[in-house]
Amino acid sequence: MASDGHLAAPLLDGGGGVDDAALLRRLYVGHFLARWGARMWEFSVGLYMIRIWPGSLLLTAVYGVVEASAVAALGPIVGAVVDRLAYLQVLRLWLLLQGASFVAAGVSVTALLVYGARLAAAGFPAFVALVVVTNVSGALAALSTLAGTILIEREWVVVIAGGQPAAVLTGINSVIRRIDLSCKLLAPVLSGFFISFVSMEASAAALAAWNLAAVWVQYWLFVSVYAGFPALSETSQISRRRADDDEAAAAAQPQKVERLWMTMLPCWESWAVYARQEVVLPGVALAFLYFTVLSFGTLMTATLDWEGIPAYVISLARGVSAAVGIAATWVYPAAHARVSTLRAGLWSIWAQWCCLLVCVASVWAGGAAPLASAWMLMGGVAASRLGLWMFDLAVMQLMQDGVPESDRCVVGGVQNSLQSMFDLLTYVMGIIVSDPRDFGELIVLSFFLVTCAAAMYTMHVYRVRKHLFHLDRILPKMNWIKAS
């Protein structure tokens, strides 16, 4: 393998470092396969549930609550498990559990789609059992996907880019996020095509078959990356020894009441570690952005449909929104090179805030021109994706750089748990404010939370840099303008 010093070349100018570039491509392909299966299921499960229980969003809402609750409650534990196990152990556990969960969910959904009506009429317990299997399998798939995300995005990427210029880590992060957003854009298109022109039952069976076949390819790709970068095995061994030492030290200490209480609450220690980090404010600010209806999710899509916007228009707007998000993965490296990670995040979050002003204006435009209001809402949300995903990349890199290696997995688990908690609150608010005519209230609430997130991040920037603007550069320019 080429030396690590050549790693920056393929990311920055496309030359040299052929072996490292090939290994990175394997990492990207493996990540693509994992995200593609997850995004297909994420899009399709709502359609499956509506078909199984026509005329009601009950099963869809219950599934969303179960999945979000599982990640919110168990996310810190997943992070702690990833931190304690060797990289290959986590890899095997992730891929095995994710593949088995998606296969089980696909099989149970297929059975519900084919036999659901008969089961509900003849044997309701069997119907409920299949729904429970689908929900539990989906929750397990989400937890295993979280483990894989922490392993690849929080650990492997940082280790691979270790000792390289900051632009290398920025480049890898951007490609990883670009893959995720591309899957978010294209996987629903393929799934929708399959459902519309073949059948929903066939799409569920194909989803199970895809995950069964893809898991072996993913394993081979990731193992080859692990073997190709010696730093990964070295870091894994160091982390494992540190975990063993911590266990031995804990066993040698007397079992005080406080330690027993901490054992009963395994998440508490993870949250305490998270709260001690220097980057806790950016992390909480990012989590606030998940408590929102200002995205092409279930609530906003349903409201647009209620307002009479055709489904194909909504899907095109969603595609434009995803394309803007993908563009953010190209813009962010350039912005990072000019203004640093911290300032790139500051400009990004306030750019998102400015775009969402159009969405707030749509609330007051709705009474006089409902169609124009809907277009303003879609346009504002789509434009805001540039700032949103640039901010996401900035916070992710701040955490990669600012969190100690020993805490990285735990912090990643808590961060995802916190984001899922706010995502869950969005579902709760949708239940409380369920009338589409009151959707404007949810828009204003979402905008308020984005404002809070921007304020928190601005406080962090001021705390670190001791200033927000270079007044020594701005004032001379103002004096020059006044003099002219």
From Swiss-Prot:
List cystine links: none
One GO biological process from the UniProt record?
A: iron ion transport
Q: What is its main location?
A: membrane
Q: Which GO terms describe its molecular function?
A: iron ion transmembrane transporter activity
The UniProt entry lists membrane topology as: Multi-pass membrane protein
Report keywords, A-Z: Ion transport, Membrane, Transmembrane, Transmembrane helix, Transport
Query: Which SUPFAM superfamilies does the protein's record reference?
Result: MFS general substrate transporter (SSF103473)
This one is known as Solute carrier family 40 member 1
